A protein has these predicted regions:
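Basic, glycine/lysine-rich polyanion-binding surfaces/domains
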Residues: 1-248
Length: 248
């Protein structure tokens, strides 16, 4: 059951921002860079994806939305300019624009407006519109309560392998598409079942070397732990199922 205070709160995720990628063969350009198959990105089906290092470590994670022939990137507001700069390095002489655009990302845990979050249906609904209304105050607690991590603070930047971020289980990677930055090591880990560590949410404790983020107000922390030593980590159904099944 969704908490009434969350249901009645605002919907605008003020810590998110949008980038518009447009121009010649935009999907082909992003297909060779990102972890997600661009053919899966439609107006009704946004997709979670990432830009990785060549070694397969997460640099930026975001949600991709179709906008006609263009693609909108729903990313951390604090990382928008850095992400634009990074993507622009790969543009070379392509007739492609990568620009910040106005607009807000909105969320509700249980309204029929928008589309289900591509990572996990239980996260709720997400949609894009003008930056209007009150801020969504319950998003972080709702997300972490489901064991889902996101953003540079929690995932790290050039620190955590993408599959250690539970990308396979939460739909953030395609193993059927062609090459992209970081694909070789990511695919090798998947097919050899070599994902030995996982980012997990746990009750707040003494921070250590493996701690990525702490939220004293929520009594929670995010840590990278070995799968045989998850300890008191929250174990949502999706993670339990993932650890019980061999990779396909």
């Amino acid at each position: 059951m969704t908490d009434t205070s969350i249901r009645n709160a605002g919907t605008w995720l003020a810590d998110r921002a949008l980038i518009r990628v447009a121009g010649e063969d935009v999907r082909g350009f992003l297909q060779g860079l990102l972890t997600q198959d661009m053919a899966a990105v439609t107006a009704e089906a946004p997709q979670w994806a990432a830009l990785l290092t060549p070694q397969g470590k997460a640099l930026f994670d975001f949600i991709l939305w179709a906008d006609g022939d263009a693609i909108l990137i729903d990313c951390e507001a604090a990382q928008r300019e850095a992400l634009i700069r990074r993507l622009s390095l790969y543009r070379l002489r392509r007739a492609i624009t990568i620009l910040p655009v106005e607009g807000g990302v909105h969320w509700s845990p249980d309204t029929g407006k928008g589309v289900p979050d591509p990572r996990l249906a239980a996260l709720g609904y997400r949609w894009l519109e003008a930056e209007a209304g009150a801020h969504a105050t319950g998003w972080r607690a709702h997300r972490l309560g489901l064991g889902v991590t996101e953003g540079v603070e929690e995932l790290g930047q050039d620190k955590t392998l993408w599959l250690e971020c539970n990308a396979s289980e939460l739909g953030g990677v395609s193993f059927a598409k062609g090459c992209y930055v970081g694909q070789e090591n990511t695919a090798r880990m998947h097919y050899r079942a070599k994902v030995n560590r996982r980012l997990v949410v746990a009750p707040l404790g003494e921070p250590g070397d493996r701690t990525r983020a702490t939220y004293p107000d929520l009594g929670l922390m995010v840590e990278l732990r070995r799968v045989e030593a998850l300890g008191d980590a929250l174990m949502p159904e999706w993670l339990v199922a993932a650890l019980a099944e061999p990779p396909s």
